[in-house]
């Protein structure tokens, strides 16, 4: 691509990248440095029911404080019963919070992309941006969703990462490439309408305007990212408690020993 087109493309992507990197830096800090937690199985939370499954195959469920493993009810003593009840309550409380956090992160990403690219690509690109973000939301929906009072969280941590991965990056690249004509017209118009008499003065004015837009977007995203980070920190602490509780549960109930739900970076609970 010629130098001018490259510069234009970089200008467009940098605004969105700056915002998204601000989001990622905040939201990933605790996840990757302190709280790397993944799920080995799918989790479904319904009123008075917790189901742990693998691609639709139920491994165990806790229903009305009763434990069923592979469809068979397990007899529990009082100590085991207390652990099962506590574990069910903790998982049932945390899964909806994780899903809410994911949805807020997606909404924040959508806002960042729209704020960054619409001024450059023009209003005509708005529909394409909406379509791209709808595709992202659809991919997220397949691994983390709420339908009424039913909550579902997919098994692998990578599923959420994939939603923001290569396919999303490719869609954004295609959006920019397909809108280069409109983008150059918008940029040219904004450059020529800038303050100053000479071309250099207009370029300086345009550069300052772009910097101002970028800083404004980054500020908006950073404020939202701070909130998500704070919520993530609280969830992290609760997940640490859940890891210990689940290990106790699996130690006390042999039927659950081979179904570790939680996996951490430092300790893999699969045996």
Predicted features, each with a name:
Residues 1-24:
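Gram-negative bacterial Sec-dependent N-terminal signal peptides
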Residues 5, 78, 155:
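Solvent-exposed, flexible loop/coil residues
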Residues 9, 18-19, 121-122, 193-194, ...:
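Short, flexible coil/linker elements and helix-boundary hinge sites characteristic
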Residues 18, 22, 67, 77-79, ...:
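General N-terminal targeting signals
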Residues 23-135:
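N-terminal Sec/ER secretory leader and immediately downstream segment
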Residues 108-111, 125-148, 183-187, 250-267:
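Short, surface-exposed, charge-dense and proline/glycine-enriched linear segments
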Residues 129-226:
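Extended amphipathic alpha-helical interaction segments
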Residues 204-271:
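A cross-kingdom marker for long, charged
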